[in-house]
C-alpha cells in the first residue's frame, strides 16, 4: 500500500515517512486489519455508489452543459489543466466514471494484498 501511496502519484514525503508507511501497512497485521476495516466501511458508506452520484449529477447538469458548450466551444480543445479533450460531455463523464471505477478497484486490490 505504501508503494501505491507514494508511487502512483508524486509525493513530497521524506524517505523516512515512506518507510514508516510501508512498514505499518505491510508488516503490522493489526494495522493491516484496521486498514481493511476502514476501507470496507468507506466502501459501504457511499464510495461504491460514487459512480451513481456522478451519473445523477451528469443528468442534472445536462441542460446547463449543453448551453455552456454551445457558448464556449471548447469540448475538443485542451483548456487550462485538462489532460485531454474528449470532444463531448458524455465522453468526459464516461472518462471520470472509468477513472473512479478503476481507482477503487486498484486500491481495493492493494488494501487486501
Language model segments and positions:
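Middle-to-C-terminal accessory/interaction subdomains
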Residues: 1-113
Amino acid at each position: 500500500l505504501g508503494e501505491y501511496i507514494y508511487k502512483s502519484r508524486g509525493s513530497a514525503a521524506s524517505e523516512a515517512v515512506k518507510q514508516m508507511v510501508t512498514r505499518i501497512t505491510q508488516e503490522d497485521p493489526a494495522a493491516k486489519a484496521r486498514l481493511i476495516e476502514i476501507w470496507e466501511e468507506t466502501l459501504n458508506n457511499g464510495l461504491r455508489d460514487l459512480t451513481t452520484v456522478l451519473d445523477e449529477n451528469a443528468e442534472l447538469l445536462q441542460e446547463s452543459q449543453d448551453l455552456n458548450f454551445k457558448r464556449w466551444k471548447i469540448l475538443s480543445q485542451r483548456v487550462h489543466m485538462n489532460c485531454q479533450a474528449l470532444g463531448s460531455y458524455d465522453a468526459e463523464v464516461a472518462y471520470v466514471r472509468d477513472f473512479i471505477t478503476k481507482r477503487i478497484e486498484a486500491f481495493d486490490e492493494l488494501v487486501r494484498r
